[in-house]
């Protein structure tokens, strides 16, 4: 089990902020979350003031990999809150996460907290995944019996994003979007999978709306949000969605333009002192040669997720618990 402890032995990313409050550098998040995020003495972020729900989950079984842990924890936490009748889960499936929210593993514990997606993305960090006693070199999850395609909740209008709006984005970015993603953005920008999509090879739960194009600055605007993610990605990559446990990004410059990558949060492989360039070279995980290939990898609402999550909740291995005091969210 030594692999599960590697993340605890090295200084976490952004360790220099230990014991300090980190404020959001952009105006939208700074206005919504003026109190920032406190980093504890060990360099782990304390997102508790922003938590809207919390779940305690049992210790993982022997031999679990980090992708298995992240996925099982997320769907079990959602199932526990769904079973508890929490209002945020009224409009999503039993194992999906409410839109605009993501699960955070609290460092050194088996507590999970539901926090706003844009808060979790403030900076690279170590927390409860990096400190978990699992195999951090073991990737992927168990194969599914059947791979059903993922479906998106498309708008009733003909397009989500107009050609004119896409051209405006490209003008702002300084390059043409990769073709497969460009077509997707026009058809389904701002849309989310119906229920949840799963990338089995990486255990990535895709249950949040993809970014879109907005007339005003917003954390779901493709151009604006990428300005907020410079601790995670170089400008060779364009983030297109928040997913459970990290970011989904496209390669937009250099080699393999259009390829799709997963940038995990709370990654035991991450180290303090690395540049953003070093992080993308060492930490990003491939999940499709282009955006069409990525979508084809996704399994739509695999029943295995609900089965596992139900067993966790029914067996008392995942249960909702009270949240701590909340920080006011403005705007």
For the regions a protein language model found, what residue spans apply to each?
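Acidic, proline/glycine-rich low-complexity IDRs
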Residues: 135, 142, 291-331
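Short, surface-exposed beta-strand/loop micro-motifs that present aromatic residues
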Residues: 104, 239, 247-253
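Nuclease and nuclease-like effector domains acting on nucleic acids or nucleotide cofactors
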Residues: 1-102, 106-147
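Structured loops at beta-to-helix junctions and adjacent beta-edge loops in soluble globular domains
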Residues: 58-60, 117, 241-243, 253, ...
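Short, well-ordered strand-loop elements centered on a beta-strand within folded domains, enriched
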Residues: 65-68, 113-114, 254-267
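A surface-exposed partner-binding patch
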Residues: 143-247, 306, 319-331
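Compact, glycine/acidic-enriched structural inserts
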Residues: 261-297
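Short, solvent-exposed loop/turn segments at secondary-structure junctions
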Residues: 108-110, 120-122, 190, 244-248, ...
């Amino acid at each position: 089990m030594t692999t599960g402890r590697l993340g605890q032995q090295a200084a976490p990313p952004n360790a220099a902020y230990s014991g300090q409050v980190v404020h959001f550098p952009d105006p939208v998040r700074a206005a919504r979350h003026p109190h920032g995020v406190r980093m504890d003495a060990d360099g782990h972020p304390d997102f508790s003031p922003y938590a809207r729900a919390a779940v305690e989950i049992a210790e993982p079984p022997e031999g679990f990999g980090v992708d298995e842990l992240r996925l099982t924890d997320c769907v079990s936490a959602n199932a526990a809150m769904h079973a508890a009748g929490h209002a945020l889960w009224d409009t999503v499936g039993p194992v999906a996460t409410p839109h605009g929210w993501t699960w955070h593993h609290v460092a050194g514990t088996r507590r999970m907290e539901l926090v706003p997606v844009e808060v979790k993305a403030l900076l690279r960090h170590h927390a409860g995944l990096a400190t978990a006693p699992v195999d951090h070199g073991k990737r992927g999850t168990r194969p599914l019996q059947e791979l059903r395609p993922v479906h998106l909740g498309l708008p009733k209008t003909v397009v989500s994003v107009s050609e004119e709006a896409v051209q405006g984005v490209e003008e702002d970015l300084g390059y043409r979007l990769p073709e497969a993603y460009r077509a997707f953005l026009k058809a389904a920008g701002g849309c989310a999978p119906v229920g949840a999509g799963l990338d089995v090879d990486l255990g990535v739960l895709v249950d949040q709306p993809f970014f879109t194009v907005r007339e005003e600055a917003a954390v779901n605007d493709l151009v604006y949000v990428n300005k907020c993610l410079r601790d995670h990605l170089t400008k060779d990559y364009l983030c297109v969605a928040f997913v459970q446990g990290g970011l989904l990004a496209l390669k937009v410059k250099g080699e393999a333009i259009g390829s799709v990558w997963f940038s995990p949060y709370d990654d035991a492989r991450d180290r303090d002192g690395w540049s953003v360039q070093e992080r993308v070279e060492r930490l990003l995980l491939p999940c499709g040669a282009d955006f069409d290939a990525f979508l084809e990898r996704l399994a739509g609402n695999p029943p295995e997720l609900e089965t596992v999550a139900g067993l966790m909740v029914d067996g008392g291995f995942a249960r909702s618990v009270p949240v701590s005091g909340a920080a006011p969210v403005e705007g």
